[in-house]
Each structure stands twice: as structure tokens, then as C-alpha cells.
Design a protein with these regions (language model features):
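Hydrophobic cores of alpha-helical transmembrane segments in multi-pass inner/ER membrane proteins
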Residues: 80-90, 112, 146-162, 216-229
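Membrane-interface interhelical loops and short amphipathic "cap" helices
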Residues: 38-73, 124-143, 194-210, 261
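Bacterial N-terminal signal peptides
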Residues: 15-28
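Membrane-interfacial loop-to-transmembrane alpha-helix junctions, especially the N-terminal start
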Residues: 98-112, 171-180, 236-246
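Juxtamembrane boundary at the C-terminal end of a transmembrane helix
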Residues: 255-261
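Membrane-interface helix-loop-helix modules in multi-pass inner-membrane proteins
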Residues: 114-162, 190-197
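Boundary of Sec targeting at the N-terminus
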Residues: 33-36
Length: 261
């Protein structure tokens, strides 16, 4: 029965992983194009009116804008808490693994929970929270598409690392899937659309701050991808990178926890 479970799990991941990689590659031009279009539309609106960064901003009440701001900050903070927890579990694993073997599965579960949360709660204008369909949101709003792409990447990381922790995926090359996915996520962050969060007279300052914060996320993400890959590679520095990898997870978690718009 166990060999059958191993075969099913491994064959499923082997089928899903290439599809995920192809999907991400196909999404990259669309993400960049949507972001560029939104930026061009925003600049054109600024030249015409110089009052609001987006045409539909005037239709949104201050209460709605404040609610959206708080929702976005909460989402980042909760994701940061889960990433922070993942780093703590990973650092503590060496000390308590002998007494609590299941702790090895704790940090992948943090990524799974984060992915599920982002998938469901990142855009509450979509069904079932509101009437807007997922198809419309994904095809008309770059930010929605990016959020769901992040969710899929987090879920993929969680599933693969959980299967590795349980001993289902034993091949050494599975250890390099995390760095590859983390690299893709970091690249997407560089194209992340922030147009919907900049409103009011100081919207340019808000935009610069949000872009700066997401650049910090991306740079830390690249560091996480690099150190995780080196931690999986046999070398004299392997032990060092195994410690540095969860440390950078703590850094990313802290950056997400202090995120403000």
C-alpha cells in the first residue's frame, strides 16, 4: 500500500509541477503588461486631472478606501506571522526533532496555511464575499491575478516540502524546487501592481513607499531562494546556509509584519 501511495503522490507532483512552471512563465508577460497598462492609465489620468490616480477613485468613499487599506495591511501582517512562524519552527527543529518528530512538518504547513489564506481572502471584492466573479477579477485586475499567483506558489511550496518532510519525495532534486519557486515569486513581486492603493493628495508618496516595501520583499525573497538552494547543495558552507535560510525567513516575516500603506 505504501509503494502505491508513494507512486501516486510522486506522479501527481510530477504532473502538477511542470504545469505550475509553464503557468508562471505564461503569466509573467501578462503580469508585466497589466502592470504597464495600469501605470500608463494612471499617468494619463494624472496629466488630465492631477487629482486622482485612478478614474474610479472618485467613486470610492473614504471609508471604503480606509477599509481596503486595513484589509491589505492585515493580509500582509498575517502572511508575515506565518512566514515568521515557519522560520522559528525551522530553527527550533534541530533541538526538538528527537522528541517531536512532527515538528519537521510544521514549517511547510505554515506555507500551506498562508497560501490558502491568500487564495481565499486576498481579494474580497470577489465571490463569495462580493458579486464579482473570479474570471472577471483575474482577467481585468493585475493585482488580483498576482495575488492568486502568489497563493498557488505558496501552496506548491507547502505541498512539496510537506511531502519531503514525510519522506514521500526522496529524490535530491526536489530540494531545488523551493528555490526555483521562491525565485519566480520574487520576480513577480518586482512587477506587483499597487495602483489600487494610492489615493489622495499624497498618492505618489504612498506609491513610492509601497514600491519600496515590495522591493524589500523581493530582495529578501531572492536571498531566501539562493540560501535554500545552497543549503541543499553539499559543500563546506552547507551548515552555514542551513542556518541563514530560516534567518532570512524571519527577516521576510518581520518586513511583512511592519508593512503599511
Amino acid at each position: 500500500m505504501r509503494p502505491l501511495k508513494f507512486f501516486v503522490s510522486q506522479s501527481l507532483v510530477l504532473r502538477v509541477l511542470p504545469l505550475l512552471a509553464i503557468t508562471c512563465l505564461l503569466l509573467m508577460p501578462q503580469l508585466a503588461r497589466c502592470t504597464d497598462d495600469a501605470s500608463s492609465h494612471d499617468m494619463s489620468g494624472m496629466h488630465d486631472g492631477m487629482s486622482m490616480p485612478m478614474d474610479n477613485s472618485a467613486d470610492e468613499t473614504p471609508a471604503k478606501l480606509l477599509a481596503d487599506k486595513r484589509e491589505s495591511e492585515f493580509n500582509h501582517h498575517l502572511a508575515g506571522l506565518l512566514v515568521l512562524a515557519a522560520g522559528i519552527f525551522m530553527i527550533a527543529e534541530g533541538n526538538i526533532r528527537a522528541r517531536r518528530p512532527l515538528v519537521r512538518q510544521a514549517w511547510p504547513l505554515c506555507f500551506l496555511l498562508s497560501g490558502l489564506f491568500v487564495l481565499v481572502f486576498s481579494d474580497t471584492e470577489l465571490w463569495p464575499f462580493n458579486s464579482q466573479s473570479w474570471y472577471f477579477g483575474l482577467t481585468h485586475h493585475a493585482e488580483v491575478l498576482q495575488h492568486k499567483a502568489f497563493a498557488v506558489l505558496l501552496l506548491a511550496l507547502g505541498v512539496i516540502e510537506l511531502l519531503r518532510a514525510r519522506g514521500t519525495l526522496k529524490a535530491g532534486w526536489w530540494g531545488y524546487v523551493f528555490p526555483a519557486i521562491a525565485m519566480v515569486g520574487s520576480v513577480i513581486l518586482l512587477f506587483h501592481d499597487h495602483q489600487g492603493h494610492a489615493h489622495g493628495a499624497d498618492h505618489m508618496e504612498v506609491m513610492r513607499r509601497i514600491q519600496s516595501e515590495h522591493l524589500g520583499f523581493a530582495v529578501t525573497g531572492f536571498g531566501i531562494a539562493l540560501t535554500k538552494g545552497l543549503a541543499e547543495t553539499p559543500s563546506a558552507w552547507r551548515a552555514f546556509f542551513k542556518r541563514l535560510f530560516p534567518t532570512l525567513l524571519l527577516v521576510l516575516g518581520a518586513l511583512l509584519l511592519v508593512y503599511v500603506e
